[in-house]
Amino acid sequence: MTDATIRIAILDMYNGEPNQGMRCIIDIINRFNHLVEFKVFDVRRHCELPEVNKYDIYISTGGPGNPLEGDGNWDLKYYAFIDALSQWNQENAVKKHMLFICHSFQMACKHFGLAEINKRRQTSFGVMKVHKTEEGLTDPLYDGLPDPFYAVDSRDYQVVQPKLSMFRKKGAKIISLEKIRDHVQYERAIMAVRFSEYFVGTQFHPEADPISYIANLKNKERREKIIEMKGKIKFRDMLEDLLDEDKIYKTNETIIPNFLRIAINDILKTRKILSN
């Protein structure tokens, strides 16, 4: 590892549970392996967090359980870590970039006081439409994606009831919402937030690929639960969505790569200016 290397910290929030998210994230990072190196930190099981000054880019994963609960140790240290990154960005020219996914996204929304987090009436799991907001139409995270686009959704909790005064105060923006459901009266959940120029988060799983989705369906209990919720026809439709190159493949190849390219370019550009 040289001084010129871009260092990425993956904050593993899965609490030791088997998952496909880590494999998918590492696969995407490896597409940039000529520029970056990474290390995994087991946040919830071992309370591992990186030193702020040692890494440049942070990806905080999805994970199981209630995002409003922790053990009073790892969760408080995690929130303090987020604050330390924010403080760093206020005081230093070379910025730290962070992506929050699913469980981490919900925790970040809570920490920043932007919205309510509550339990859904039923689990959301599958290939879902995601709609860009007006702000999302021009957000660089989504460059190359249509509107709406498709993503893998897997959540028991949701982010709703945005506190718009807090969004304005912090300069945060809602950049996508869940699918439009004309047949129900429930509020559309927030699917992504631009917390700042350097922090962004998604409720859905931008790392997911068809392999990860199929791996989840190998769990008989989960597969039967999805069929019970959606019916066999919609279940078959979801399987067809997996093979559509303009759906999950497109999202996997776009969002995290965009995040990494933006972060890497910003860091290298600033380093070059400072070295002159």
Give each language-model segment a name.
Residues A9, K39-F41, I59, L99, ...:
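Hydrophobic/aromatic beta-strand patches that form the interior of the parallel beta-sheet core
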Residues G65-G136:
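Cysteine-nucleophile active-site neighborhood
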Residues M1-W88, I211-I214, K220, K225-N276:
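N-terminal beta1-alpha1 cap of cysteine-dependent amidohydrolase-like domains
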